[in-house]
Amino acid sequence: MDAIAQLNRMGCETWAAAMAMDGPGARIARHFDQINILDEPKLQAHILRHQIDAVYSTGSDLAMPVACRLSEKLGLPHFVSSETADICNHKDRMRERLTRECSGNIPYQVMDSVQQATVGFPSILKPSDSQGQRGIYLVGSQQQLESRFASARQFSRDGRVIVERYIDGPEISVNGYLVDGRLRFLAASDRVTWPEYTGLIHRHVVPARAVGRAEDSRLRDTVLDACRRVGIQNGPVYFQIKLEKGHPYIIEMTPRLDGCHMWNVLQKAAGVNLMKLVFEHLLFGRVDELQKLRAVRPMELVFWCQKPGSQMERGVFKLPRDAVEHFYYYQNGEYVRPVNGKFDKVGYYIRKL
């Protein structure tokens, strides 16, 4: 929705595609077409039929490789190759491409059937190619790994899981922006998760309190090194990182904006509208939005969540008086769609700290 709204403000004609017209983005796009985003031949025909100038996704790892492949085939603008997008969409390929020489990489093991874990415990068990925090488990023993294995693998399109050494320390989200291989923007936020749901986001706090001057320098080096290894030279990057004794370890990385509206928080906090920057850079080659960068003002984004399958009930959520913006994904009485399948986002608010 955020991307479509930005393009509408820029005067672009917007086309949205999805399997169903059941999201807020579909309602505000100039045109909506019911197309499976994985159906590349149908999408290609649609793009050619309507003479569409660019195809892009700002928040979906599943859509990124498709958008990049179509852009390569049709000569449309794109930031990264389809290979790079595919590497970032497959955690096993990402770990392999980063190599052991990357200081931010984590010991890992890929499995397509139950095996003895070699990375030690505790460890993180997750699908090799899923998004939305689906099928992620913290396991403390071989027995726990085996009991959770099938549940994690069911979310993998390739039928594989990855087991990674558990990194003990605070978790941060990192939004960056590259221009011709230079890291021109970097902002870290504390990533506060729900204690009862491993990895599921509750709050983002800007600037990250877990990042001091020493950590910031290491963080920049790690992000830039990882981008070079996987082939990201231009456009947005998003990382989930954990700091263990001040050292940054990469949990996830992807060549897109995050899916948590952090562009909105960062515009209010640091002056740069990353969503606008993405499309001005992609469509027109302009990056002057970066000149608006200023010292970061403390802010937070807080998500409201409900169990999937429940009915939206706005009245149960408290909106602070000092909130500067808020949004609900559902109307009262609408059913919450399963995304992570455990505790799904139904809205958010942003406030100054």
PLM feature segments, named:
Residues S123, R184, Y249-E252:
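Protein kinase-like catalytic core scaffold
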Residues A117, L277-L353:
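Peripheral (often C-terminal) accessory segments that flank ATP-dependent C-N-forming ligase machineries
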